[in-house]
Amino acid sequence: MAKVGKRTRAAREAFVGKDMVSVEDAVALIKGAASAKFDETLEVAMNLGVDPRHADQMVRGVVTLPNGTGKTVRVAVFARGAKADEAKAAGADIVGAEDLMETIQSGKIEFDRCIATPDMMPLVGRLGKILGPRNLMPNPKVGTVTMDVAGAVGNAKGGEVQFKVEKAGVIHAGVGKISFDAEKLAQNVRAFVDAVNRAKPAGAKGTYLKKVSLSSTMGPGVSVDLASATSH
């Protein structure tokens, strides 16, 4: 335990006095302080000037990171017939209809992304209370209710990240592994922040992007200069 404590303390000391730094400096600091025995994820937290309790201030979307996430994404697809075959050929991990619904209802959820063809939504809709809170409910706004199941599976496995604002006006996402090259992590951060900026809802008033922080899975966070966090 003492060893872990020293490591954590050393990591935190490296962050003292570091605030509103560039993305590159933040990434370098986080990579240098990462000390977990596994390949940690670089995580972005964005504080937005929205109140998601109002429908016209909801922020959600999807972005394909230029350098991927480094994460193995397990994909489930609700489809029948030719579309089910298409999903399997594209590399979906689980494909089904009523059988998949029953598996999920039993509490067995072994996937990170759920895709459905439009005709399957009446069936999938019964799972709203299970999938909704886990942010797994297929949604046409983020391309997971589609007839192009092969494309959706490919995107999910190829570095696509979904985002949705939480009650406090915060968006969290993993944008790569600490083992990634620093430049690639910086590119991913900016791609994600740009996507959230583009998703600014019509009802947002005042300052939209308030704060951007970066951290590793186990490490402390550091605030990033907002101008540095965007690519333009």
Swiss-Prot record:
One Pfam family name is Ribosomal_L1
Gene Ontology biological process: regulation of translation; translation
Please provide, in alphabetical order, the Gene Ontology terms of the cellular component aspect for this entry: cytosolic large ribosomal subunit
Q: Does the keyword Nucleotide-binding apply?
A: no
What is annotated about its quaternary structure and interactions? Part of the 50S ribosomal subunit.
To which protein family does this belong?
Answer: Belongs to the universal ribosomal protein uL1 family.
What does the protein in this record do? Answer: Binds directly to 23S rRNA. The L1 stalk is quite mobile in the ribosome, and is involved in E site tRNA release. Protein L1 is also a translational repressor protein, it controls the translation of the L11 operon by binding to its mRNA.
Please report the name of this protein according to its UniProt entry. Answer: Large ribosomal subunit protein uL1
Species the sequence originates in: Cereibacter sphaeroides (strain ATCC 17025 / ATH 2.4.3)
